[in-house]
Amino acid sequence: MCLGRESYGRTYAVVELSHLQDNIREVKSHLRKGMQFCAVVKMDAYGHGIVEVARAVEEECALFGVATIEEGIILRKGGITTPILILGVVPKGQYRSLWHYDIMPSLFTKEQGVALSAIAKKEGKSLACHLALDTGMGRIGIQVEHEGAVDLGLELFSLPGIEIAGIFSHFSSCDDKDKTYTEMQERRFASYLQTLEERGIKLPLCHISNSAGILEGRGVQYDMVRDGIALYGLYPSKDMERRVPLKMALSWKAKISHIKEIPAGEAISYGASFVSKEAMRVATVPVGYGDGYPRVLSNKAKVLVGGNPCPILGRVCMDQFMIDVSQVEAEVFQEVTLLGKEGEEEISLYDWEEWGVFPYEFLCNLGNRVPRVYKMKGKWVGTYDPLSSLHSEEYQEEES
């Protein structure tokens, strides 16, 4: 179902799908020819909408990375046919769904392998998996430095009905300026792969480079890279050199719900943390931390009204916050920009990061009361309303 902007009188986020495509092409232009690309779309594509994002970038991808089997199933039900890899752990009770929906799990224990092999025999069909290695992230995977790590890998390769289609690991600190730990992970990964080869294993698809690795040129000598946060237009760390130009895909809008005049000495919001020093014109924005707007931005951040920065007054409430519009023209129902560009001004997640907002966390926490409205090169093409489960059956053009 495609809905116009008028359907959202309170707030909505805009996702420019062409920016996702541009980011992939920009990243690929810095990689060697033939490098395969995995788009990481876990956590509802970092809050952007998993099905809509996957549809927009599928032609550029060899693989989609998700965190849970439920996310993989959502993609399959959304018509995605590209291979899917679960980067996390699949509960044993959901193993059979891997066959039903043609989804690959991460494999790293004998118990997993034996159980999956037994199901493969019953199903009469092998299951493709990726071998997960822990080279220093400390999360999941075969601990490559432990005694027996290679033997475990060989055993998993030998299980009937199990096809090891890939081997991967994950950088933990590649966005740090000091690359000592990353270099150690690179050595461990390369050493494990070399040992497998020496023991007679023909290596499948190998990948270790994440967004930070891609942007820093680390781990890009292998067969594939996995792009997460950079796909959506952000660098993993504000301290990284901006070698690759990226476009932020998501912006956030709201409409003023109320405007009032207040005298000097008037308190605003909970705790009276802001008290006016003079007469002011104050507008209410009907968005709060219940929608994912960070409370830590109270009395700090600004929004754009007519392209003009207007500061937040007092604490951000669950559903509303107030701004100073004394110096700008503003009216009820006027659209304001909470995040993104308006005219020559921009509110960015890097600005918020200065006040303790972690960009990844914000995107993942953008609430389900905030509809996502999709554009393709500036044209409105679809809407996803999490509360109403309104997934677009197909993108439809609508003049903006």
Predicted region positions:
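Active-site-proximal beta-alpha core segment in soluble small-molecule metabolic enzymes
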Residues: 2-7, 11-15, 19-22, 32-207
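Active-site anion/phosphate-binding pocket segments in diverse small-molecule metabolic enzymes
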Residues: 2-21, 44, 71, 90, ...
